[in-house]
């Protein structure tokens, strides 16, 4: 079974999709005048601006919800997995994916606001399925349907449930000897109570947990790096040389390792920051704003925080401790071992705490993404049926094989990204026009 899905994954995440993902980001970066560089400071200032339009939640709450879904096991387990199989060079390719992915995330956020609608319950609905149909026309509806179907699969079979629950359950079992099955069932009960409150309930939890968990984890990794400060130059040498010549803990010949570094780096980068996946604009659409460009700018900060900051710190912490070279360590235990070199036995507790928070908030965020995709296909009448299915899948998350879970997650991620990337390319003239109009009106010095 694992071998079959691994072959499917290699096909889905082959050169065409990787080229489309990075290529879309590169294309948008040039068309938008590298908005991710020129407007990053403005973007961070906008996060806490006063709400000025219709919507269900504040722009900050929308970003917190998106980050809740984005900052998850990919930042801890995914980075460790990428480095283990692709070597230190995988981290470089994660940076590449993130840099160009910021332009992609900007475009997604902009389109989410421009083409959002209200559902029959009076709540805001938006995301790729809406900007595909409302922006590209009804003839493109099959693409919107395909995206929504893939989004449901990602939510209930990939990022939203299995990978997160399995990471929480495995970590708690490793640290506290708690049964994975017991953990899965408890998580299912907690999630049940929260997701039935909808986006407002999810965003309230996210607003409180996300800043705390991110700051706690960043401080912990900075301490590890500071203790091993003398190894930082060599670590960066490994990252840059490994990106083009290949160095992996698992061995193999150079060409294959470089290919693995590129594939794992970009795939894990997308898994982590979700740029191009089409998930974040679903949350962005609910923001109380009337300006698409401003929400686009806010959205792209999510990729910066997730990958350029958190994933980078995870990767460097693993590399400076040298634990990535130990053959029997992979996934969460590899990151855990790196923490233990500085914090001793407390390292396991600290990482477990962070991992549980990261994964739990991702479950909440993805429950909403899947719900909106489900609503697009089946209407609001059957939303509770989706929520029950989602909770059941959470309960099953601790029963599956880790390797198989990650492979399935990668496959459905790729299927979800494809229709969204097509939409971004087709709608790129509108993205550019909206961007030029906004910066012209605000008298920005440099127009894209």
Residue ranges and their predicted role:
Residues 1-73, 83-90, 101, 395, ...:
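N-terminal alpha-helical transmembrane segments of multi-pass membrane transport
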Residues 9-42, 84-122, 143, 306-313, ...:
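Extracellular loop-to-transmembrane helix junctions
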Residues 17, 32-36, 74-79, 155-168, ...:
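Transmembrane helix-loop junctions in multi-pass membrane proteins
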Residues 20-27, 31-44, 165-172, 179-187, ...:
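Membrane-interface loop-to-helix entry segments
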Residues 24, 28-29, 100-122, 129, ...:
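Helix-loop-helix module between adjacent transmembrane segments
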Residues 29, 108-116, 120, 222-238, ...:
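Extracellular/periplasmic helix-exit of transmembrane alpha-helices
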Residues 34-58, 81-83, 87-91, 95, ...:
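Flexible loop linkers connecting adjacent transmembrane helices
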Residues 54-85, 111-135, 146-149, 153, ...:
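Alpha-helical membrane segments and immediately flanking helix-loop junctions
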């Amino acid at each position: 079974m694992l071998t079959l899905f691994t072959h499917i994954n290699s096909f889905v995440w082959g050169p065409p999709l990787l080229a489309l993902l990075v290529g879309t980001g590169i294309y948008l970066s040039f068309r938008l005048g590298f908005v991710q560089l020129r407007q990053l400071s403005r973007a961070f200032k906008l996060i806490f601006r006063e709400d000025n339009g219709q919507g269900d939640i504040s722009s900050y709450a929308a970003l917190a919800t998106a980050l809740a879904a984005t900052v998850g096991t990919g930042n801890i387990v995914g980075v460790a997995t990428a480095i283990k199989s692709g070597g230190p060079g995988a981290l470089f390719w994660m940076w590449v994916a993130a840099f160009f992915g910021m332009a992609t995330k900007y475009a997604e956020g902009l389109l989410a606001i421009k083409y959002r609608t209200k559902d029959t319950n009076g709540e805001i609905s938006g995301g790729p399925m809406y900007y595909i149909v409302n922006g590209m026309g009804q003839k493109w509806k099959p693409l919107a349907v395909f995206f929504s179907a893939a989004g449901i699969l990602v939510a209930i079979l990939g990022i939203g449930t299995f990978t997160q629950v399995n990471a929480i359950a495995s970590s708690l079992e490793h640290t506290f000897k708690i049964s994975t099955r017991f953990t899965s069932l408890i998580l299912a009960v907690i999630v049940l109570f929260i997701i039935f409150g909808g986006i407002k309930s999810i965003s309230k939890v996210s607003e409180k947990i996300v800043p705390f968990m991110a700051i706690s984890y960043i401080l912990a990794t900075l301490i590890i790096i500071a203790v091993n400060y003398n190894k930082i130059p060599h670590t960066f040498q490994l990252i840059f040389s490994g990106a083009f010549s290949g160095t992996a803990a698992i061995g193999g010949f150079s060409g294959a390792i470089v290919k693995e570094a590129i594939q794992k780096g970009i795939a894990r980068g997308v898994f982590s920051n979700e740029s191009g996946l089409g998930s974040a604009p679903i949350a962005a659409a609910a923001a109380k704003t009337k300006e698409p460009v401003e929400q686009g700018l806010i959205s792209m900060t999510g990729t910066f925080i997730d990958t350029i900051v958190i994933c980078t710190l995870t990767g460097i912490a693993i590399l400076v401790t040298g634990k990535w070279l130990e053959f029997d360590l992979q996934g969460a235990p590899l990151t855990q071992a790196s923490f233990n070199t500085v914090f001793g036995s407390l390292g396991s507790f600290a990482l477990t705490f962070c991992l549980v928070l990261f994964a739990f908030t991702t479950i909440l965020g993805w429950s909403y993404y899947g719900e909106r995709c489900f609503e697009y296909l089946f209407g609001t009448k059957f939303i509770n049926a989706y929520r029950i299915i989602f909770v059941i899948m959470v309960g099953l998350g601790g029963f599956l094989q880790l390797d198989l879970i990650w492979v399935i997650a990668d496959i459905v991620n790729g299927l979800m990204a494809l229709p969204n990337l097509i939409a971004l390319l087709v709608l790129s003239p509108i993205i550019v026009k909206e961007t030029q109009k906004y910066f012209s009106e605000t008298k920005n010095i440099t127009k894209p």
